[in-house]
Design a protein with these regions (language model features):
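Short Gly/Pro-enriched turn/cap motifs at secondary-structure boundaries
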Residues: 57-61
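Short, thiol/selenol-centered motifs that function as redox-active sites or metal-ligating centers
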Residues: 62, 84-93, 131
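Short solvent-exposed loop/turn micro-motifs enriched in small/polar/acidic residues
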Residues: 50, 62-63
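Active-site cofactor/substrate anionic-group-binding motifs, chiefly glycine-
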Residues: 84-85, 100, 106
Length: 152
C-alpha cells in the first residue's frame, strides 16, 4: 500500500491514511461508484459562517464527527454544508445528507432516514451503515437548533 503509487487525489491519500489502519481499501469493491463519487467529490462541503443554525453529532465507537450548517428561508433549507471527520462512508453519507435535505422543508428534512441516505448512495457495507446515522442525527440537531433560535 505504498502511497507513492496511488496519488489520483488528495482525498484518495486521506482515505488511504484513515481507512488503511482498519484494513480497508476503497477500491477493492467494498464501495460502489456512487459512494466513491461522493467521497472523492463531496457535495456542499465546508463551513458556513453566516448559517442560521448548525447541528453536530459524533459516534463515540468509531470517532466519526459531523457538523451540518443550514440557511433556511420560509421553513425551507436553501443552503446546507458540512464538515466531517471520518471514513469514506462517513464523508459520502454526509455529502448525500446535504443533497437530500437541500430544498426540502424542515419537516421533510427531519423525516430523512438512515435507510434513505444509504439507499441514495446505492448501499453501504453492513459494517458502515452506522455512518448514515451521522447525517440524520446532525440534521435533526441542526433543525432543532434552528427552531430554538427562530421560534414560530
Amino acid at each position: 500500500m505504498a502511497r507513492e503509487r496511488l496519488k489520483p487525489s488528495v482525498a484518495h491519500d486521506i482515505l488511504r491514511l484513515s481507512d488503511a489502519e482498519k484494513g480497508e481499501n476503497m477500491f477493492d469493491g467494498t464501495y460502489n461508484d456512487t459512494v466513491i463519487d461522493h467521497f472523492m467529490s463531496p457535495r456542499n462541503a465546508g463551513t458556513m459562517p453566516d448559517a442560521d443554525a448548525e447541528g453536530s453529532f459524533g459516534d463515540s465507537d468509531c470517532g466519526d464527527y459531523l457538523t451540518l450548517y443550514l440557511k433556511v428561508t420560509n421553513s425551507v433549507i436553501r443552503e446546507i454544508s458540512f464538515l466531517v471527520f471520518g471514513c469514506a462512508a462517513a464523508i459520502a453519507s454526509s455529502s448525500m445528507t446535504t443533497v437530500l435535505a437541500k430544498g426540502r422543508t424542515l419537516e421533510e428534512a427531519e423525516a430523512i432516514t438512515e435507510k434513505e441516505i444509504a439507499d441514495a448512495l446505492g448501499g453501504l457495507p453492513e459494517h458502515k451503515l452506522h455512518c448514515s446515522m451521522l447525517g440524520v442525527s446532525a440534521l435533526r440537531n441542526a433543525i432543532e437548533a434552528y427552531r430554538k433560535s427562530h421560534p414560530a
